[in-house]
Swiss-Prot record:
MF terms (GO), sorted A to Z: calcium ion binding; collagen binding; endopeptidase activity; metalloendopeptidase activity; zinc ion binding
Name by which UniProt lists this protein: Collagenase 3
Residue numbers bearing the Phosphotyrosine modification: 367
Glycosylation sites: 118, 153, 159
Chief location of this protein within or outside the cell: secreted
InterPro entries for the chain: Hemopexin-like_dom, Hemopexin-like_dom_sf, Hemopexin-like_repeat, Hemopexin_CS, M10A_MMP, MetalloPept_cat_dom_sf, Pept_M10_metallopeptidase, Pept_M10A
Residue span of region Interaction with TIMP2: 177-247
Disulfide bonds: 285-472
Binding positions for Ca(2+) 2 per the UniProt entry: 163, 195, 197, 199
UniProt xrefs under Gene3D superfamilies: Collagenase (Catalytic Domain), Hemopexin-like domain
Chain residues that bind Zn(2+) 2: 97, 223, 227, 233, 241
Residues the entry annotates as binding Ca(2+) 5: 294, 338, 386, 435
């Protein structure tokens, strides 16, 4: 279709009345502003069965506001209520890819994949945020993420029309899907096909970097090129193709297993994968599941595993899974131990010889600190688990086969510590992966087993599988 004819369609209007229901006086979200509701309406219109450039819905199913909100909550693993709550709004406010999660995103007919393995790309223009060399390096590295696991080859063109045309632009930039200024929508790409098919556009109102500051161009480009090759968004929060941007750290990037499965379904495997071990997202109901750390946080329970955590809330019917860095970008990908200090409204996170103090989702100034500040000798290299007792002001730390007890009032370790875990808590084994306390019971986790230990009787009263904590 000629672009001029396509532009004429933009004058068509979508006359259906479409708005979020305003909560009544009994709802918990009375404090949400009109701006919040407007943001939510824009979000759902953009990412859940969006209009095509003609102003017409591509699909008729799930086009009511409540249906779209339910679909969005289901996509992100939130409690499906059809109501705009704080958790849903938090997701909507995170920076993300501009490609819809449900519904097509294209101007011209798309195809499932490219019919060839040798593809070309061209960098049409550059962002002023990085040198030309840095931009070229980021894009080359992003394409390599996909060529490493498939037979695909990518060749750069310096003029003419390539299969994948890459450009930076702002607001209205010629494809009828405008950018929105800083943050929010970061970039978008079109699926394989003619004309715009395969093209990737980056919002130049963002600050593009090669680090954790601003938005990392390599990570965003690798995601967008996944769309250019035919992949849709993934519901897996650990996948590169998850729609929300998360800086994953400075270490060598390895494509997650979910993305490998998706791209190899389209193009098949490559001859030799330089990274044969691709990270998988943990399954909460895996009978062999072990945990890294557990802590409460303002009435919720946070359960850490690898680079993820599950969030448990008494009012939810299922555990919600998130990347740790999507909430705390400055923390390490993996943590060793965690505990809450309710009277200070703080949680403490441990990794190796360092620990962080957090107020909600904000890291306190002056952190991380060394665990030696708490009184640990130099031969203690990590804390494997920790639990705080608000009534006594004591905190138990587990490291190797030993347990330490810290006095919060005197800010020092208690005398006669450390002790052997087996002596203080007989029956739970000689190591602790994670621990928490509730209603007079301590719950010790050791591999796939958890022990319910009575503080009053000093004995194990129940043995359960670890995954029962996650309602499995």
């Amino acid at each position: 279709m000629h672009p001029g004819v396509l532009a004429a369609f933009l004058f068509l209007s979508w006359t259906r009345c479409w708005s979020l229901p305003v909560p009544n006086d009994d709802d918990d979200d009375d404090d949400m502003s009109e701006e919040d509701f407007q943001l939510a309406e824009r979000y759902l219109k953009s990412y859940y069965y969006p209009l095509n450039p003609a102003g017409i819905l591509k699909k008729t199913a799930a086009n009511s506001v409540v249906d779209r909100l339910r679909e969005m909550q289901s996509f992100f693993g939130l409690e499906v209520t059809g109501k705009l709550d704080d958790n849903t709004l938090d997701i909507m406010k995170k920076p993300r890819c501009g490609v819809p999660d449900v519904g097509e995103y294209n101007v011209f007919p798309r195809t499932l994949k490219w019919p060839k393995m040798n593809l070309t790309y061209r960098i049409v223009n550059y962002t002023p945020d990085l040198t030309h060399s840095e931009v070229e390096k980021a894009f080359k590295k992003a394409f390599k993420v996909w060529s490493d696991v498939t037979p695909l080859n990518f060749t750069r063109l310096y003029n003419g029309t390539a299969d994948i045309m890459i450009s930076f632009g702002t607001k209205e930039h010629g494809d009828f899907y405008p950018f929105d200024g800083p943050s929010g929508l970061l970039a978008h790409a079109f699926p394989p096909g003619p004309n715009y098919g395969g093209d990737a556009h980056f919002d130049d109102d963002e600050t593009w970097t090669s680090s954790s500051k601003g938005y990392n161009l390599f990570l965003v480009a690798a995601h967008e090129f996944g769309h250019s090759l035919g992949l849709d968004h993934s519901k897996d929060p650990g996948a590169l193709m998850f729609p929300i941007y998360t800086y994953t750290g400075k270490s060598h990037f390895v494509l997650p297993d979910d993305d490998v499965q998706g791209i190899q379904y389209l193009y098949g495997p490559g001859d030799e994968d330089p990274n044969p071990k691709h990270p998988k997202t943990p399954d909460k109901c895996d009978p062999s599941l072990s945990l890294d750390a557990i802590t409460s946080l303002r009435g919720e329970t946070m359960v850490f595993k690898d680079r993820f955590f599950w969030r448990l809330h008494p009012q939810l019917v299922d555990a919600e899974l998130f990347l740790t860095k999507s909430f705390w970008p400055e923390l390490p990908n993996r943590i060793d131990a965690a505990y809450e200090h309710p009277s200070k409204d703080l949680i403490f996170i441990f990794r190796g010889r360092k620990f962080w103090a957090l107020n909600g989702y904000d890291i306190l100034e002056g952190y991380p600190q060394k665990i030696s500040e708490l009184g640990f000798p130099k031969d203690v290299k990590k804390i494997s688990a920790a639990v705080h007792f608000e009534d006594t002001g004591k905190t138990l730390f587990f490291s190797g086969n030993q347990v330490w007890r810290y006095d919060d009032t005197n800010r020092m370790m208690d005398k006669d510590y450390p002790r052997l875990i087996e002596e203080d808590f007989p029956g739970i084994g000689d190591k602790v992966d994670a621990v928490y306390e509730k209603n007079g019971y301590i719950y010790f986790f050791n591999g796939p087993i958890q022990f319910e230990y009575s503080i009053w009787s000093n004995r194990i009263v129940r043995v359960m599988p670890t995954n029962s904590l996650l309602w499995c």
